[in-house]
Amino acid sequence: MTWLAAFRAARWRPLILGLMASLFFAVTFVANEVVSRTGGSWAWNAPLRYFLTLPVLFAYVAWKGRVGALFQSFRRDFWRWTAYGTVGFGLFYAPLCLANAYGPAWLVAGVWQVTIVCGVVLTPWLSAPGPDGRRARIPARELVTSLGIVAGAMLMEMADASQMSWRRAALCAVSLLVAATAYPAGNRLAMRAYAGAFDPLERMLGMTLGSLPFWIAWSSASTALVGWPTLRQIFGALLVAVCSGVIATALFFRATDMARQSPSELAAVEATQAGEVVFALVLEFAVIPGDRVGWLGAVGLATVVVGLLVHGLAMAARPVSSEGGE
């Protein structure tokens, strides 16, 4: 059996894809911080990412010959696609960029891990009812492990967060809470409605199209308030669009698609986003000079890694789900 065949058969394949996604997602935090430090406004980071992602996704869907089917669905379910795109992309990324303007990349990436708990807690409301008509319950074991991962991420933040003013800290926290709730909500609702009809990249194009009214209004306001984006900011947004908007989101959507039949596996996959803290810290160390985390941060980092390992071992011990065994 080749390594590729072994990977395809692995029970923990969704977890690996989730971790790969977290690496590319980490680029977002670092790139946005670099742009903020070089004078670019955070208000343009969000719409530029999705404007630049749109042609890439369209080219992929056109290459597959699926544009007609997607557009037909978009016309039929315009308001549904608009709602999913606005929540999953608009109310996720705009607050995230605001938070990124008030703290270093690794700090924002760490606090962002509250999305893991949000995803688990939202399970009963965002999962499809079972054959008996009952909705899935909150997976208790995965919730405990996810809370442990978030606790580790919080330890990494304590030293740096103490240097922020209460106003900045509160604004950052509220922005991240909105983003952390909107992202799993939009993703799961769209996955529940269209996972059988469209693959992850096709679904991303539909959600991106649905988010355009939000981004057009947002960019119009940004132009009036801060002017046009700089050329350097456009290049930074292009990097984010490719790494995070296409590669990372496609990997993450694929991982959640594979685990969608099991609330426990889905919770474990969403917990892989904690890897963003580690990757953001490494990337920030490589490209941005500044203070680093001390021993408390190291303890938090170890806690995050242990939590991810617990999720991985739990998934490896389960039977392969109908999606995960593809």
Please provide the spans of the model-predicted regions:
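Hydrophobic transmembrane alpha-helices of multi-pass small-molecule transport proteins
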Residues: 57, 124, 137-160, 294-315
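Hydrophobic/small/kink-forming positions within alpha-helical transmembrane segments
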Residues: 26, 30, 85-90, 94, ...
